[in-house]
Amino acid sequence: VLDADFTPSLAGPAILEKSTDPHLTSEIARYNLEINLDPFVIQGKALSETHRHLDDQWQKVEELAARQHKKLLLCGILPTINHQHLTVDYMSPQELYKILNDIMRMTRGKAFDIQIQGVNELIASLDSVLYEACNTSFQMHLQVAPDDFVRTYNWSQQIAAPVLAAAVNSPFLFGRELWMETRIALFRQSLDMRTSLNHLREKQARVFFGDHWLENSVSDLFKEHIARFPLLVTRPVEEDSLLAIANGDVPALRALRVHNGTVYTWNRPCYGRGGGRPHLRIENRYVGSGPTRVDEIANFAFWLGLMLGQP
């Protein structure tokens, strides 16, 4: 969400207040909004339907923004963003974001530092997690059968480099030319809660790609993440998952899903349920937003084609 001079705007929450569409949600910064698309069965004109849905949702938000005299832009890293847009005044008002920020600051025990070496070098420091707000992505999900998950997840890891190479679009941050896709380095460092001692112990960063192939089942990934990363936020959980299964119901696994949402693997395993049935998905998180809706659908088609065409 941009002001007339194409700098980040504070108007995101005001736009969100005027919307009754559940597809539109907030993000950590007031100038970022998220559009969630409906799932489609991969057959016939699925990509065209996804494109049409994206266009329809975009037009709705664009009209709401225009009433506030604001503009919308799809961009992995906005070239006009700078440190003045990373103060707490620009953080979204929802309590969750304040809690996450406070917990991460307390865990780290010092400011969040970034050092990125590219064509130029950037060294900067911030006392909040709002470096994360510089990143926006086009997150793609593919539902996978449980029996195929290990093979498909490993394949998603294998193809990540060529897919990212075809989709890079964020070379600039704070006026510096850095990586061809600066989001990768920035996101990893912006949420790195490790102290120097943690680094010496080779503790895993919370944003990571992975360091081994998956061998047995998706539960190995979830167990590994639970063992490696402490809880950041919790919510009341009244459901007894084992009892739900015994009664023939589909458990929500709410605690697992909340924790999984704070582990930022570039290919993230996801558990969900819909229509009374559980499902597993692989979420691609490394492709940037934009620069146009056509580009996003093209990136989706490329990734989807590779995922479905695995040898």
Question: In which residue ranges do the predicted regions lie?
Answer:
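Phosphate/nucleotide-binding catalytic core
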Residues: 1-311
